């Protein structure tokens, strides 16, 4: 039997999410839209008109999108007819369910574009691509489904996913990891693995059979470093904008001497570096058909022509105007969407840049009264830190 058919059979027998997690979207946590806005370098709030959920299972993620974006049309597809039948039943009571259309479709087939319809501003594929025999074909389909400025949210297994370590151990106990068969013996071995691995945050021995059958067991499971997933994406014509998990690790580089050493790496390049040093178990990535802005970090005079633009990821109260431009002020940045608080010691000239970072004026225009007294190296390093944190984007000089 072909691998694809075997995988379909898993979800026909045990549709996912399991009954315990089917809250018509209530239990599904989406990526913060403010973070997506920030790394997508948007100057206005993101409001997708059409959303595609690829590999929707019984519809929990689709209902969550319908609740978050009340004006959006949501199309959700899955290759399991049984899962789609359950999703349509849940749709009757789900908030925003009338704006969700469910279809049986294979995301590896070019027919996906025809079934899904008009292009989408947002495509989400969460926890699916790791179990697909030909991920490149799927990614090319997603490119065909996206509008030119659309984004893809991709959730895939990382190099430290439990399956990497656990599947070889299962075989040592005589358990076939290619197919899940519920038994007391299997649960006992999983409890042993839980214990020997230091009791993970979420016990696999206690997980629902539907999760175990498709995520830990099964005929195929790609658990790759971010760099390898990114290679698949680049070949399909997609540009990595950022990794949600790597975003948190960057906060440890607030010491200016440390973060300056990363220049001129983009957010995506830093994300790959973080994953090399701290391999993720699961990647939540944002990609786009449109390449990110290339900021000239190594060319200070060109950088001065860029236009700083604040994102909506942080809130902060700026100190008052006046005083020496090199006077250091304490600035606290708070982000409820990503549960982050950052405290910076910023000179007055940096405060003024933030005060006027509306995308209308270049750095040179903002600093014109005092530019000779602002060290260019300090300016570049300050802007790079704010960029990596997602506080600002630097728009091109050309409008």
Residue ranges with predicted function:
Residues 81, 251-289, 339-399:
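Long, charge-rich, low-complexity alpha-helical segments
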Residues 179-256:
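Substrate-binding/catalytic lobe of Class I Rossmann-like enzymes that use SAM or dcSAM, i.e.
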Residues 112-123:
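A short acidic, Gly/Pro-enriched loop at the edge of an enzyme's catalytic core
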Residues 136-148:
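A short glycine-rich, Lys/Arg-flanked "PGG" loop and its adjoining helix->strand segment in the class I
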